[in-house]
Design a protein with these regions (language model features):
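Structural preference for solvent-exposed beta-strand-turn elements
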Residues: 1-206
């Protein structure tokens, strides 16, 4: 695998992935992000076995397709430390990811891709495209009412409902309730699901 990208194309996405990958993991591979270069894009994947986040970096140059996994925290801290507008070069050489620019070179240890545990989505075939701005506003106006450690686990999250051309979100901690809704451009399948609190908080960052 060999590719290049500027700091700005990677830093924000790695920050989001790191927030999932580095939660005091006891399984080493879960502290890593998967980097996959193919079809002219770089895909960054992080999981904690409950959540999986996949982000695509299109503003990059792929020389050789491939994939590897590397420490999310170390990679993010390294990229964050370089000056803005720095062009970074990445190449997997044996068991290391070599990262270089005009002024430095660093090597990070990698772990086998086959050990990376993808969340099985085959049984979850509900897909929806959301308007990030509208979704974010309703999420912000409702998520504050979620419970944080209630024994009634369903309160530690947010109800997400699709019905016809409406998207509704409801949160409550048993004492207060917040509801929000916005119109969707297409007719939607009627669905109800609970978004866990941790996922809702991550989504509040990603929608921006």
């Amino acid at each position: 695998m060999k590719f290049s990208a500027k700091k700005e194309a990677l830093a924000d996405k790695l920050s989001l992935c790191s927030s999932i990958a580095e939660k005091r993991q006891t399984i080493p591979i879960l502290s890593n992000v998967l980097l996959k270069a193919n079809n002219g894009n770089l895909t960054i994947v992080a999981t904690d076995l409950e959540r999986q986040l996949s982000l695509i970096v299109s503003d990059c140059s792929i020389s050789d397709d491939g994939e590897t996994t590397v420490s999310a925290r170390k990679l993010f801290e390294l990229i964050r430390s370089v000056p803005d507008d720095t062009e970074l070069n990445f190449e997997v050489i044996e068991n290391q990811l070599e990262i270089s620019a005009l002024s430095f070179q660093a090597d990070l240890a990698v772990l086998p891709v086959q050990d990376f545990p993808f969340v099985d989505l085959e049984d979850h075939n509900f897909n929806i495209t959301l308007d990030g701005s509208k979704f974010g506003k309703v999420l912000e106006s409702t998520s504050f009412a979620m419970a944080s450690a209630d024994v009634r686990y369903y309160l530690n999250g947010l109800l997400f409902e699709t019905a016809q051309k409406k998207i509704n979100m409801v949160a409550t901690d048993g004492h207060r309730l917040a509801w929000g809704s916005y119109s969707h451009s297409e007719d939607l399948e009627d669905k109800k699901l609970i978004i866990p609190r941790s996922t809702a908080l991550e989504l509040s960052l990603i929608h921006i």
